[in-house]
């Protein structure tokens, strides 16, 4: 595929386009935080990004989100765009992020593009400490231990009624990319049509109210694909690369949500009086706002250092470590922002309560902080 390298002028123009979309169309649709966007509205807004070229669902790479992760300016665009979208709607940003990654994988493997999704978790998380060994073996050729092989084959099996995968997305999609790990083949990718799957809509677990958790499993009698979609030696590299981009995207979306919560709290503290002075002049409020601001700025600094594509386990482990450290801080920042508003901060029409729930939900996607820490620790033992 021919690469489309961005110039700094291209980057500025694309970011301006996303900013304008977020401040107008997306802001209008999310003006009432206690009333999540209906799926039809969310899908229509995704369609606008497709029309603008911000999201690319064609079979040729262009300048859309995650079109060329080898281009540092394209990575910078993706991260800034996701932050901008998340400032208005973290759930919308997450949908766009996952859809862009699925389109990237489709283009990379020569598969048709479309309203695809990609799942980058097993049926029970990441496989804990077994995951790094399988990825290291991809690069070094080292054999996977029998214990790790058994754990990975269980966690990353094809979705069944007993071991389903979970998709958090809009309800209308046609195909989903599923990675599996098989003892005799290692990493494999399967592009499964919705018609071959049982899709069960679930109740909202916590945050990202714009999207629907969906439990997916193969229909009875459906024979899994006999051949891998992409060559065996490429499958694990695709998993390594997409896992890194997925984590980088979450590291962009969560600060966008926390920054919005902080902005609401800062504005409130600058107008609310208690005992005479504005509450921003009270030490307790200043402490809450200061700590929340530190967490958001720390996340910004960390994100600026993650523009390199994940071509090795070491680089992916860096993202695991950043996520494990930063997601709890960003959740705390959103919580501190909510506390500044006092009792009304818990009211859903204020918006901060939803942003806190969104941050909490983002913390658990793609591995909890505890599991990411375990994976990082295991990587250190292997190299």
Label every PLM stretch briefly.
Residues 76, 80, 100-104, 253-260, ...:
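Short amphipathic alpha-helical face segments that pack within enzyme cores
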Residues 251, 258-261, 265, 292, ...:
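Amphipathic alpha-helices that form helix-helix packing interfaces
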Residues 36-47, 280-286, 313-326, 345-361:
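Charge-rich, acidic-biased intrinsically disordered regions
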Residues 36-191, 195, 375:
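Glycine-rich flavin
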Residues 5-7, 14, 203-296:
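Glycine-rich beta->alpha junctions and the first turn(s) of the following alpha-helix
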Residues 27-37, 62, 296-327, 338-346, ...:
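C-terminal helix-coil-helix/basic helical segment that borders enzyme active sites and/or dimer interfaces
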Residues 3-4, 341-383:
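Glycine-rich phosphate/cofactor-binding loops in nucleotide/flavin-utilizing enzymes
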């Amino acid at each position: 595929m021919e690469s489309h390298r961005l110039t700094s002028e291209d980057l500025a123009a694309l970011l301006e386009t996303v900013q304008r979309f977020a401040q107008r169309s997306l802001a209008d649709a999310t003006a009432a935080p206690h009333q999540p966007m209906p799926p039809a509205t969310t899908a229509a807004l995704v369609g606008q990004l497709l029309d603008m070229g911000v999201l690319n669902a064609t079979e040729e790479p262009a300048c859309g989100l995650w079109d060329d992760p080898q281009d540092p300016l394209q990575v910078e665009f993706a991260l800034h765009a996701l932050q901008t979208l998340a400032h208005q709607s973290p759930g919308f940003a997450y949908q766009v992020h996952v859809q862009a990654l699925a389109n990237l994988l489709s283009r990379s493997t020569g598969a048709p593009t479309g309203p695809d999704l990609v799942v980058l978790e097993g049926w029970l998380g990441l496989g804990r400490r077994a995951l790094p060994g399988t990825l290291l073996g991809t690069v070094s050729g080292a054999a996977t231990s029998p214990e790790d092989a058994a754990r990975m084959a269980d966690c990353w099996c094809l979705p069944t009624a007993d071991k389903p995968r979970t998709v958090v997305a809009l309800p209308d999609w046609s195909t989903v990319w599923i990675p599996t790990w098989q003892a005799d083949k290692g990493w494999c990718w399967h592009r499964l049509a919705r018609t071959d799957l049982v899709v069960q809509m679930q109740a909202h677990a916590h945050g990202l109210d714009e999207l629907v958790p969906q439990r997916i499993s193969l229909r009875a009698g459906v024979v899994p694909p006999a051949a891998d979609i992409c060559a065996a030696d490429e499958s694990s590299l695709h998993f390594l690369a997409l896992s890194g981009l997925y984590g980088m995207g979450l590291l962009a979306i969560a600060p966008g949500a926390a920054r919005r919560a902080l902005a609401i709290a800062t504005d409130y503290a600058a107008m609310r009086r208690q005992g005479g002075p504005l509450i921003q002049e009270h030490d307790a409020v200043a402490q809450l706002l200061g700590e929340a601001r530190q967490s958001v700025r720390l996340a910004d600094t960390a994100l600026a250092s993650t523009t390199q594509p994940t071509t090795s386990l070491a680089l992916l482990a860096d993202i695991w470590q950043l996520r494990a450290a930063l997601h709890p801080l960003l959740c705390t920042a959103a919580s501190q922002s909510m506390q500044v508003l006092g009792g009304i901060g818990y009211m859903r029409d204020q918006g901060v309560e939803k942003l806190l729930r969104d941050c909490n939900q983002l913390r658990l996607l793609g591995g909890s902080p505890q599991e990411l820490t375990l994976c990082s620790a295991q990587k250190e033992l292997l190299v």
